[in-house]
Amino acid sequence: MCATLHISIFLSNLVCKTCKVLNQELMANIYSDRIEALRGLMARNGWDAVVISGSDPHASEYPAPRWQQVRWLTGFTGEAGDVVVTMNHAGLWTDSRYFIQAQTQLEGTGVELHKTRVPGEVPIPQWLSENARVVALDGLCWNVDAVKEIESAMSASLEEYREEGAPAYSVVDEPDMMDALWEDRPWTPVTPVTTLDVDCFGGTQRAEKISWLRKWMLLNDAEAVLLTSLDEIAWLLNVRGSDIEYNPLVISYLIVTQDYVKWFVKKPSFAGELDPDTADSFTELSEDGVDIEDYDAIYSGLADLGNECSGVFVDPSTLNHHIYNCICDTFPAESVVFGKSPVILEKSVKTESEIEHLRQTYVEDGVAVERFLHWLETEVATGRDVSEWEASERLTAFRAEILGYRGNSFENISAYGPGAALPHYSTPREGSAVIRPCGLYLVDSGGQYLTGTTDITRTVPMGPCTALEKEDYTLVLKGMIALSMAVFPRGTTGHHLDVLARMPLWRAKRNFGHGTGHGIGYYLCVHEGPQSIRWQYNPQPLLPGMVTSNEPGLYREGMHGIRHENIVLCREAGSSEFGDWLEFETLTCCHIDTSALLPELLSSDELAWLNAYNEHVYSTLAPLLPSDTALWLRDKTLPVES
């Protein structure tokens, strides 16, 4: 009987693997054909190279399907990646979060992986300067800074080889160039628009924000400001939508002068009538002096602006190259003022009402995650086969029970064993791994709520773990605790603090490639700036009110991945004769599993922090949990002895 069953399982797995291989080969051929079609377009237009951005006209991290051009062309599904195609080469440039994923997804497509932020690797601008003279790009999807880097590299290369008679270079702006190849390309999304009740859910009134921006404009001699980043516009106008998955944003542009505010946005309608939510929102906006214009009217709006103002302020890190070219058709180059948008910093410092809502939101989010972890451990312990996908869906279901839930803040990362070695593992609906009662399971997830945005990662021992898994688990946790305990002088940047999270790993000659921390929006994007905690230099100091992730990790290809992530609030920590001091308050409220911990590797201070944190989680969440989950959590949060 057992032998027959094993043979049946073996044959079933063999068939599944064969089908998977055949499907991969079929898709690889499709992507190869698309690249060849693009080369045909290049030949007809005399382009040496085409560069394709993984972003959209608003520099979004998560573009809507219409702008997922990298995915359509190559099959790569990571959130960060740009493609270069020449007549004899196709390459994808992405960072360490996606190296393993890219190697798998690009197999057979003819697209070569180029690693970014790795010593010795050539970035796109330099590569283009060495391999092309005429470069075409969709200017709608490349920001001004990125295009200037390409132009600068190509110009420098031209100067170097001028004596050899090298031809002049050119960067061709070809908006929506993929329309010629992508027959069923999606349209720009249009979803209902809602406004936020800040009296109920925290924040600052729209009129106050607009008044603040106008004061900033007066102080900085800016007659007009063009905002193109969707989260900045959503924050300033207190509007939300669902044009982009996981991000409550509305695709739009915004012009602000001392005389008017014009919002360029697509208007969702049915049978010629606005949907009720949008109609009410537009009425409210109009009452606050916001003029509603059609999205595509941005071009005429910029032309009108040229007749009304002598200059305009823009942020070249988010303004797309095509719109910039249109601005230059209206304004002299010296009248287009580049700078960092003031909205980015103002948005990152949460108000007292937002902070209070966030504290409660992280408690409610913690209840959902604890219920999920209890369910998962119980199911796996009873011998039931729970797949990564089922686990992910169950976690989402627990979150969906929370009042004010508006969806996930990003795609759940539900990864068991080797899958967790991919920092941004994409859990497949079909064929995802079964979670076994041994080793490590990593779950990185978050929710969008009217009262804030959450993000949390827990690495969970599902049963017996190897000595290496335990050591890695403990070293990563030491780094997270070190950063959590940090006290630092005002003016400190995340660049200064990053080493705290890495030092325990570095001492063991281990490391991780991604950043340690990113800013988090308030019912906005789960990734925001200007602050960050990473080894790359960022001049932005951490300020009281900023909410940032604390998430060191460690990844061993083919074995396991570990990441511990809490969200921390920067707050004041008093003063001394040496100045003003800051510290972190941990907002995340979910226990840290200690069953894979090596206590002897933790200092007494680290153990004290861990025990105090777990006790806080238990005392806060136990009254809100079902009785069986509360009993389970009591066992999970018992103090660890050294």
Q: What spans do the regions from the language model cover?
A:
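The N-terminal extracellular segments of secreted preproproteins, especially immediately downstream
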Residues: M1, V15-T18
